Amino acid sequence: MHFGPNHLSRFCSALLATLLMAACGEVNDDRIPAVSVNLDLSNQGYWDLYGVHGLGQYRYFIRNAGIPANFPYTALSYTGFGGILLVTDISNSPLAYDLACPVEVDPDVTIEFDTDNLRARCPSCGSVYDVCEFEGSPVSGPAHDNKYALRRYRVIPAATGGYNIVF
């Protein structure tokens, strides 16, 4: 039997997808405590001002620190354990993660997004996470060694044009 370039390409793609699914099943994304998350960006004006609109854009939301400045937090606003990282994935869909590093499990030790490589890094332990393509999976460092992924939050489209971020 002869396998042409198309067959080989399909086989490699299927093999890669299978390996990624198997690897994702082994990752622990529950190290960060489950605390309330509710961020209302459902108003189109709020989304236009505070949302993310393209690959490489990001935003931090930390209610206790007043980040971003002048954001209209309400009594019903909750930004998780260490805050929220809002990014755009490779298909321009918004994704949200807790900012706390799952290795450190400390709300004051937060990951930082790097716009040059589209990954997030913990300045304390050095772990690197893929936040734009593989849903917060660890790429290197102690998080990779221990299979600790970032805690993901749901980003739900709103009827009014923006999004809501919830746990």
Role assignments for model-derived ranges:
Residues 1-24:
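Sec-dependent bacterial lipoprotein signal peptides
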Residues 18, 95, 116-119:
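Processing junctions and N-termini across compartments
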Residues 27-114, 130, 151-167:
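N-terminal pre-ligand scaffold of iron-sulfur
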Residues 117-127:
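Cysteine-rich micro-motifs
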Residues 128-141, 155:
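Short metal-binding segments enriched for Cys and/or His
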